[in-house]
């Protein structure tokens, strides 16, 4: 249980294992702080340009002073001073940081944490978005629709055993059995990503998962309880798509992104999700293990695509780490959030489109700022060197140049994403 969690249906007794700076929220905040301490690539490039600009300006100023000494010695100092004042390395230095600060401010108000320095820059360039299903496009609230037993246990006992097996699991399926937990002990529990969970219950090694794992049968999309070779019960599960998933996917398609769905669930469950959402997926695949998801993302990257991965679970951690930019949704596991470049703090999939929109606007404003800073200096420096600008005019122009860059960046804080 993470700090700040709210029990849904009953009181709980907890043992505190971490407090203060050791909590998951503090760990996420440290990730954000580290991201902000490391300057993005574009900011570092702007800093290098500004440093070379200062060196070049110094050389030009000295040359201008010497030239004016031989032409009109009485104005040499005034012209050199105006040249130094009107030049604006500040505009170059502010072009990127001002835009990034405004972008991060906007994203924080939307409940979006950016945990990697270059994530915004990468997010602006993505053309493909890959989604997990359970807990991402669905609400993660699974329900048991039907139970079939095979003579060894009753329906009630099968549900209680399943609840014991799932007690310590963070998988969304676990919530479907919590109401049937009668307190029986499950020991030596182990989870196999993409297959299921195993533990010793009532002195017997039992498994809960796909048919091949739990009961040595052909996979039919249901959840099976067994000992690895024979079946005790079969559960038909159902879930509800998130109400904001359809509009969010439509918004991403409107932004020009190609969408893919990779899920560890059955073919029927994936097909039902796609049909329910009327989702414009270019492809969808079921029974995907973590390594299968990662391989698919690698394949898309090898085709030249910039891939964003959206997920929430332990199974998604490897592919989140392997994507060009990764997004962990609110309520996901700690490992998924620690593996992600962007973390959604609110249960709103529309935030993904808002983040991409902000990233693209940020890139556009950075380019505008850099173009303005360069253009301003290309015009202002020759005028100052020619003696056409007095120092007070140079000071005013320099201030206005820096102010223009800052005000342009602040437009990011005012925009409203569609």
Question: What do these predicted regions represent?
Answer:
Residues 51-87, 111, 276, 371-397:
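Helix-interface capping motifs at the ends of transmembrane segments in multi-pass membrane proteins
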Residues 345-418:
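Membrane-embedded transport module
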Residues 1-81, 242, 358-365:
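Actuator/coupling domain of P-type ATPases
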Residues 18, 38, 203, 227-368, ...:
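Conserved ATP-binding TGD loop and adjacent catalytic N/P-domain core of P-type ATPases
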Residues 144-257, 267, 279-297:
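P-type ATPase nucleotide-binding
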Residues 49, 53, 80-91, 310, ...:
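Hydrophobic transmembrane alpha-helices
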Residues 6, 78, 88-165, 319, ...:
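Conserved catalytic phosphorylation-site environment of P-type ATPases
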